[in-house]
């Protein structure tokens, strides 16, 4: 019953016998035609069954014989020498008749013992053939009347079998995928040559930024830290884009020229003296530009500045520095201010006497409140005490002798005041003692 298994042990499989597990590899030879093993119909999509490589390209298969067994229709085998012209399947007639491939999938290492296992293996092989696009094989006339394809016609019609076959399958599958767009939409179909327009990878846009040379439409910059776009979609560099965003206008390409100084303003000349250089441009009553000199002259005098006063250069004032150390006048022993020119600067004693007497006359003296009641003339008393303060040791005899009214001793003391020219620091203390003596006497 299982002669094919014994034959498979003696003879090794020829090259290409298990190529992708095609259904033709499980067909028995003529010697095993009476075997009751059933080979099911391969489950190949209808779009693949109508391909050109399944039609023609080999010798006609022999008519299958039907055996009256419980397994159903018997397999039909190919005659000896059917595939002698094929380079991959060519073998001798005796060997081709004797060899019969095992009815199991090459994935299993043990032979099938029942018909159901062989049928399941054949079905799995058929699914693999349909999935990987390597299906097809020899089928008898009893199995839908299909013919066994051969390599001679296939190789003869195409220069390179695999690319042409893949292109044909890819085109047909692309058409089926376009019709259904469901089970055929897989990454494998995207890589087929027959795929019409594969989807664009989203990351390719990122590479376009490096491959495509962008240029700023405003300034023509080729590189920038950040590319921006204006309202119309044109590319702008970072500087031009920020300028347009903040100001609403295009960034100026040429830097604006620096404003000329007022002294050299282009196109201006004084309407009165026709000078072109001035520190300040003014306007007259008519609105015409005039130089600073003519404008000030007209403002101060009310008449135009005479042309004879025009000078080629600009005359500027020599301003005095603001931080000048003011000269401080020397102070006297009691804190009063003395004139800067004292008697020591001149050898004339009369000048020294007159200056000291004038300062003594203007010097006030503190008096107690009781003095004004005893002495009615406070001014004469102040002069008297200021004059007496310069005499020094002779203060006590003079004051003790003059115990009269203020009118009596004012005149002799005033006469002696002309000769007083020296002041001592202790005169104020002596005056206080003598004053106390006068008040208490």
From Swiss-Prot:
Subcellular location, record wording: Nucleus
Bilayer-spanning residue ranges: none
Stretches the record annotates as Disordered: 60-107, 313-392
Zinc finger (GATA-type): 216-240, 270-294
Distribution of this protein across tissues and organs: Heart, intestine, liver, primative endoderm and gonads.
Extent of Gly residues compositional bias: 66-82
Subunit structure of this chain's protein: Interacts with ZNF260. Interacts with the homeobox domain of NKX2-5 through its C-terminal zinc finger. Also interacts with JARID2 which represses its ability to activate transcription of ANF. Interacts (via the second Zn finger) with NFATC4. Interacts with LMCD1. Forms a complex made of CDK9, CCNT1/cyclin-T1, EP300 and GATA4 that stimulates hypertrophy in cardiomyocytes. Interacts with NR5A1, ZFPM2 and TBX5. Interacts with TBX18. Interacts with GLYR1; the interaction is required for a synergistic activation of GATA4 target genes transcription.
Known role: Transcriptional activator that binds to the consensus sequence 5'-AGATAG-3' and plays a key role in cardiac development. In cooperation with TBX5, it binds to cardiac super-enhancers and promotes cardiomyocyte gene expression, while it down-regulates endocardial and endothelial gene expression. Involved in bone morphogenetic protein (BMP)-mediated induction of cardiac-specific gene expression. Binds to BMP response element (BMPRE) DNA sequences within cardiac activating regions. Acts as a transcriptional activator of ANF in cooperation with NKX2-5. Promotes cardiac myocyte enlargement.
PANTHER family: TRANSCRIPTION FACTOR GATA FAMILY MEMBER (PTHR10071), TRANSCRIPTION FACTOR GATA-4 (PTHR10071:SF154)
Protein name: Transcription factor GATA-4
Originating species: Mus musculus
Phylogenetic classification of the source organism: Eukaryota, Metazoa, Chordata, Craniata, Vertebrata
Gene: Gata4
């Amino acid at each position: 019953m299982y002669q094919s298994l014994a034959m498979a042990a003696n003879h090794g499989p020829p090259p290409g016998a298990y190529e992708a597990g095609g259904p033709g590899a499980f067909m028995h030879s003529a010697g095993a035609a009476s075997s009751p093993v059933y080979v099911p119909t391969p489950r190949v999509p209808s779009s693949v069954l109508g391909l050109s490589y399944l039609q023609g390209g080999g010798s006609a298969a022999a008519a299958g014989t039907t055996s009256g067994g419980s397994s159903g229709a018997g397999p039909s085998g190919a005659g000896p020498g059917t595939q002698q012209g094929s380079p991959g399947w060519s073998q001798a007639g005796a060997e081709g008749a004797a060899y019969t491939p095992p009815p199991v999938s090459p994935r299993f290492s043990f032979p099938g013992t029942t018909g159901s296992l062989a049928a399941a293996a054949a079905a799995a092989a058929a699914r693999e053939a349909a999935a990987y696009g390597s299906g097809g094989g020899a089928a008898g006339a009893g199995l839908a009347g299909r013919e066994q394809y051969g390599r001679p016609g296939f190789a003869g019609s195409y220069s390179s079998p695999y690319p042409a076959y893949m292109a044909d399958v890819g085109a047909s599958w692309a058409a089926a995928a376009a019709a259904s767009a469901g089970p055929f939409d897989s990454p494998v179909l995207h890589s087929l040559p027959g795929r019409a327009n594969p989807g664009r990878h989203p990351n390719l846009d990122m590479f376009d930024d490096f491959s495509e040379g962008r240029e700023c439409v405003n300034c023509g910059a080729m590189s920038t830290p950040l590319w921006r776009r204006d309202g119309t979609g044109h590319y702008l560099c970072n500087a031009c884009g920020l300028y347009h965003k903040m100001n609403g206008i295009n960034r100026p390409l040429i830097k604006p020229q620096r404003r000329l100084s007022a002294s050299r303003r282009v196109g201006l000349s004084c309407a009165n003296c026709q000078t072109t250089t001035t520190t300040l441009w003014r306007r007259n009553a008519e609105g015409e530009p005039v130089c600073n000199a003519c404008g000030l002259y007209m403002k101060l005098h009310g008449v135009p500045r005479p042309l004879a006063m025009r000078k080629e250069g600009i005359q500027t004032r020599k301003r005095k520095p603001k931080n000048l150390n003011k000269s401080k006048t020397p102070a006297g022993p009691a804190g009063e201010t003395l004139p800067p020119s004292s008697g020591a600067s001149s050898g004339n004693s009369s000048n020294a006497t007159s200056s000291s007497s004038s300062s003594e006359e203007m010097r006030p003296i503190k008096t107690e409140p009781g003095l004004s009641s005893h002495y009615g003339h406070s001014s004469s008393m102040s002069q008297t005490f200021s004059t007496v303060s310069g005499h020094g040791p002779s203060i006590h005899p003079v004051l003790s002798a003059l115990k009269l009214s203020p009118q009596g001793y004012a005149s002799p003391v005033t006469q002696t005041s002309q000769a007083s020219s020296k002041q001592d620091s202790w005169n104020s203390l002596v005056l206080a003692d003598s004053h106390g003596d006068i008040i208490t006497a």
